[in-house]
């Protein structure tokens, strides 16, 4: 089964998405948190054996350097260098944001003009950009990246990881649906509580994606950085009141 996640247009596009979730000025965001989310995302791609292009890895190296500088004792020279690296990164993200807004503006104008001509509009390179903002897919994947990172730490500490030859997505789909029996909703991270190893965690996630794809499940996230809940797809589904 081929489940495709929407790729970002590059590392700056991913960073911009992460920064935008804070809904504040780019220069005020908690950069260490953003770096950790970026690294978790890249690590998850690798764990799922999805291709990670070189530019993402180069950026990951730069981010790890910035993070390490921020964790060092506050010696003046080191602090200045760390601040310079951080400010340079934030400036790159800000410039990319402006470029992307310009691209979206040009695309809107292009579509507006196309209404007055009979021929089909020419495709622009920005056409795929709006799919990046699909919260259902992207926020789910980013949330899963954080869950997987925590589960890896848990497995490393336990030293009792149970391995199996193979996990089937079809079997995991049944487990996911059974987890919702008698519940209005299930918090995403609770789905992975009983998982015994990384491969089981990943297969559970792929099963969840497939159930969303087939519209058997829906996602609910009431606010940025809030918990993501899984719910069975029903007609005119309502978010249960707390």
UniProtKB/Swiss-Prot annotation:
GO biological process, one term: cell division
Any Pfam family: SMC_ScpA
A GO CC term assigned to this protein in UniProt: cytoplasm
Keyword Cytoplasm included in the entry's annotation: yes
Localization (cell): Cytoplasm
Keywords: Cell cycle, Cell division, Chromosome partition, Cytoplasm
Top-rank lineage group of the source organism: Bacteria
Subunit structure: Component of a cohesin-like complex composed of ScpA, ScpB and the Smc homodimer, in which ScpA and ScpB bind to the head domain of Smc. The presence of the three proteins is required for the association of the complex with DNA.
Function of the protein: Participates in chromosomal partition during cell division. May act via the formation of a condensin-like complex containing Smc and ScpB that pull DNA away from mid-cell into both cell halves.
Family statement: Belongs to the ScpA family.
Protein name: Segregation and condensation protein A
């Amino acid at each position: 089964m081929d489940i495709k996640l929407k790729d970002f247009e590059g590392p700056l596009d991913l960073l911009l998405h992460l920064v935008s979730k804070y809904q504040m000025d780019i220069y005020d965001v908690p950069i260490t948190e953003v770096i950790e989310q970026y690294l978790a995302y890249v690590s998850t791609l690798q764990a799922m054996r999805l291709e990670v292009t070189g530019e993402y890895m180069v950026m990951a190296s730069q981010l790890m350097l910035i993070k390490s500088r921020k964790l060092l004792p506050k010696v003046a020279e080191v602090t200045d260098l760390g601040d310079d690296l951080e400010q340079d990164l934030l400036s790159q993200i800000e410039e990319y944001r402006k470029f992307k807004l310009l691209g979206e503006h040009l695309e809107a104008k292009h579509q507006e003009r196309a209404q007055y001509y009979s021929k089909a509009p020419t495709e622009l390179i920005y056409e795929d950009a709006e799919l990046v903002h699909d919260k259902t897919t992207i926020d789910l994947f980013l949330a899963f990246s954080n869950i997987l990172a925590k589960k890896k730490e848990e497995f490393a500490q336990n030293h009792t990881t149970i391995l199996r030859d193979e996990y089937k997505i079809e079997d995991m789909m049944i487990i996911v649906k059974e987890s919702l029996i008698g519940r209005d909703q299930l918090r995403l991270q609770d789905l992975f509580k009983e998982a015994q190893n990384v491969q089981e965690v990943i297969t559970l996630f792929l099963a969840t994606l497939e159930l969303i794809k087939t519209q058997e499940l829906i996602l609910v996230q009431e606010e940025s950085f809030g918990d993501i809940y899984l719910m069975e797809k029903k007609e005119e589904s309502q978010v249960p009141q707390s």
